[in-house]
């Protein structure tokens, strides 16, 4: 039990959280209205998620590979980022952003004391000299403000999800790409030092994406930070999804199979203790999320063999809930009885929900910018219908982009019946789309 693996959580009273919620609403409203938060920051923001972050990252990588480029990425690891925020620097940044009355924030941050309680024994109280209160409502948005100008020190693409940071660059020469990313990582390290944050170089990872044919050329790809070599990997875990060098999804599917098989084995061993509803609930809560997690970004790139292996696992889950024999055939009626969509249709469902948000302007701009509505191009009806549809750009037809979210989501949306596209409420759209997908069962 290494104490370094634990994080302090502030135990705050209810009244303080009521006040925090009011200030949070005002602060977020101001930052969004003035468009201050970094465009590619996906953490703790309404309409943003791990899904949108991964969709943007994977589609960008696919786009660059389709152009014949190598794509290098460095995963940055920060030491206790939330716990080392400097109060004075944060207050200065808030003032630069135009936030008034920073004295209130100074009072909120300073004067706090904490102790550690283990087994009923408490340590001495110590003053908190840095860090945003973890477990608070304001802490996350204050941290976003603190690292908001990180991108100003860089010339490469920066993708953020709270403190999960990635540096991304592309180019046709692998050696030039290595040198460029090394320089960018050093610039990032300098920015972190200036802002009293610490880079954990030993835990940083680098990866290069390319077609299988070009991977042999990538042997010399390596990223350094002031002489320290950053560990290169063939697959990297980012926001719960394994990304491999050619975005085949093989590493991620292998991880899913291992986790789902383990969970199902445990559930089978305890099946006699559970009734139908309990089994269904447990599978929905403990197993199904492995299939669903950010599936819009990775599933289309998976080959047929791997998709079949996922399908076999899902059918095994159906047999478990319905008390069927191991060799029993599972058909559409069994899925309908459980109210579960097959994996292929679940992916379609999630893509259509994202497409709806894009269509209605509810998704992040970094996703919406790849979608063009027909009404913004044509002033007349081109398909014999008044229903709007998405137009595909020429580059989305390139080989690597065919499996992208951008390309496949447009196809799914354009195939959707016109009456579904006219729905204005998101919750209603979700319900009716599920019913529409179940019609074929």
Language model regions located:
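Conserved pre-catalytic core of RNA-dependent polymerases
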Residues: 1-133, 169
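Catalytic palm active-site di-aspartate
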Residues: 7, 41-45, 71-81, 131-139, ...
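Short, conserved catalytic/metal-binding micro-motifs enriched in Asp/Glu and His
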Residues: 7, 23, 77, 94, ...
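Short, charged alpha-helical motifs in flexible N/C-terminal segments and linkers
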Residues: 62-70, 189-207, 214, 306-376
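Basic, alpha-helical interaction scaffolds
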Residues: 228-297
């Amino acid at each position: 039990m290494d104490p370094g693996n634990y994080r302090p959580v502030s135990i705050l009273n209810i009244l303080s959280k009521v006040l925090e919620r009011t200030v949070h609403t005002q602060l977020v409203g101001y930052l969004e209205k003035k468009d201050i938060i970094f465009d590619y920051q996906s953490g703790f923001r309404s309409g943003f998620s791990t899904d949108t972050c991964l969709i943007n990252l994977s589609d960008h990588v696919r786009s660059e590979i389709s152009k014949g480029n190598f794509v290098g990425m460095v995963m940055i690891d920060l030491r206790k980022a939330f716990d080392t925020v400097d109060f004075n620097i944060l207050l200065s940044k808030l003032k630069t952003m135009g936030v008034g009355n920073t004295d209130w924030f100074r009072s909120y941050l300073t004067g706090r004391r904490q102790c550690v309680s283990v087994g009923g024994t408490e340590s001495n109280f110590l003053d908190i000299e840095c860090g945003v209160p973890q477990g608070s409502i304001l802490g996350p948005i204050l941290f976003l403000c603190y690292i908001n100008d990180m991108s100003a020190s860089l010339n490469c693409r920066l993708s953020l999800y709270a403190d999960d940071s990635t540096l991304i660059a592309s180019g046709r020469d692998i050696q030039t790409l290595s040198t460029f990313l090394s320089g960018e990582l050093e610039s990032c390290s300098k920015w972190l030092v200036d802002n009293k944050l610490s880079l954990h170089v030993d835990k940083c990872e680098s990866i290069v994406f390319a077609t299988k044919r070009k991977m042999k050329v990538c042997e010399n790809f390596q990223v350094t930070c002031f002489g320290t070599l950053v560990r290169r990997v063939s697959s990297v875990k980012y926001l719960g999804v394994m990304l491999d060098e050619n975005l085949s999804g093989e590493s991620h599917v292998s991880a899913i199979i291992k986790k789902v098989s383990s969970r199902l084995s445990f559930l089978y061993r305890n099946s006699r203790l559970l009734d139908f509803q309990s089994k269904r609930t447990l599978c929905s809560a403990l197993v199904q999320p492995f299939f669903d997690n950010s599936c819009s970004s990775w599933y289309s790139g998976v080959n047929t063999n791997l998709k079949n292996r996922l399908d076999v696992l899902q059918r095994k889950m159906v047999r478990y809930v319905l008390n069927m024999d191991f060799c029993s055939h599972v058909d559409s009626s069994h899925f309908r009885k459980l109210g579960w969509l097959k994996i292929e249709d679940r992916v379609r469902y999630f893509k259509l929900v994202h497409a709806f948000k894009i269509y209605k302007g509810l998704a992040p701009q970094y996703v919406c910018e790849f979608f063009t509505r027909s009404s913004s191009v044509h002033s007349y009806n081109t398909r014999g219908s008044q229903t709007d549809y998405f137009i595909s750009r020429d580059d989305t037809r390139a080989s690597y982009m065919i499996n992208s979210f951008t390309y496949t989501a447009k196809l799914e949306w354009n195939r959707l019946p016109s009456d579904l596209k006219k729905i204005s409420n998101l919750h209603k759209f979700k319900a009716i789309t599920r019913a529409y997908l179940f019609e074929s069962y």
